[in-house]
Design a protein with these regions (language model features):
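OB-fold and OB-like single-stranded nucleic-acid-recognition modules
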Residues: 2-144
Length: 144
């Protein structure tokens, strides 16, 4: 019995460490959050204006979009292999700092379908309280 309790304790510590470091273990990530079914359905049905939550690995950093509201942009790859553009409004939310290729980013925002896979935006609070607030999580920090 002591061995089982010890193993449970060690597993919990390891899980906490993995999450804190932003390390993604695909099977563990899917198990811990479910299947991201709203995002999968939106991708498959080419839907837009869908509030979604998920996680991906940064595959490419892009230059900021400075026309109109400024957006930090990067591409993430989901565990399914699908890629998405993240467009994070840095006029309304802090820039995601120390972001590198290979980093894991969790997101909650609005999905817009496009032929390249789609865009996640509204990853920030709405100062007018007319839209659901979103966020990005990276290396233990939340950006909203």
């Amino acid at each position: 019995m002591k061995i089982i309790l010890f193993l449970v304790f060690i597993s919990a510590l390891a899980y906490g460490f993995v999450r804190e470091q932003g390390i993604s273990i695909p099977a563990l990530s899917q198990w811990s959050r479910g299947s991201d079914s709203a995002l999968q359905a939106a991708l498959e049905n080419k839907q837009s204006d869908v509030q979604v939550q998920g996680e991906g690995v940064v595959s490419r950093l892009l230059p900021d979009d400075n026309e109109g509201s400024r957006h930090q942009r990067f591409i993430i790859r989901l565990v399914t292999g699908q890629t998405l553009l993240i467009a994070h409004n840095i006029d309304l939310a802090p820039r995601v700092t120390d972001l590198d290729g290979g980093d894991t980013v969790e997101f909650y925002g609005e999905y817009e379908w496009n032929p390249k896979g789609g865009v996640i935006h509204w990853t920030h609070h709405d100062p007018n309280n007319r839209h659901v607030g979103g966020w990005l999580k990276h290396r233990g920090n939340t950006y909203q």
